[in-house]
């Protein structure tokens, strides 16, 4: 009887330690995830196809996107990054 009580106490202590470590890891993940990185230019879907066919540049000051279609502008990615570098 005494051995089973000691084993039960050890299991409870180990479980509490594991829960504490898990909560500590979740807290550090929340601190890291609070900083969201938004890339300046991203490839997205602009037409009705399921293919990413344009590049958009997000302007945080005016909260709007400038987009260039790959069909109209073959160098859409370069245009997007050039436009973003002008804003800095």
Curated annotation (Swiss-Prot):
This is EMBRYO SURROUNDING FACTOR 1-like protein 3. Expressed in stems, leaves and flowers. Belongs to the MEG family. It comes from Arabidopsis thaliana (Mouse-ear cress). GO terms for biological process: suspensor development. Keywords: Disulfide bond, Signal. The lineage of its organism: Eukaryota, Viridiplantae, Streptophyta, Embryophyta, Tracheophyta. The keyword Signal applies. InterPro entries: ESF1_brassicaceae. Pfam families: ESF1. Disulfide bonds join 41-56, 54-80, 57-67. Residues 1-22 form the signal peptide.
């Amino acid at each position: 009887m005494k051995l089973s009580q000691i084993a039960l106490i050890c299991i409870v202590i180990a479980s509490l330690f594991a829960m504490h470590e898990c909560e500590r890891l979740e807290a550090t993940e929340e601190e890291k995830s609070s900083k969201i990185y938004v890339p300046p230019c991203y490839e997205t879907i602009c037409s009705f196809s399921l293919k990413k066919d344009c590049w958009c540049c997000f302007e945080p000051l005016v909260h709007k996107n400038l987009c260039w279609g790959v069909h109209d502008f073959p160098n859409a990615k370069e245009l997007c990054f050039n436009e973003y570098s002008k804003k800095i």
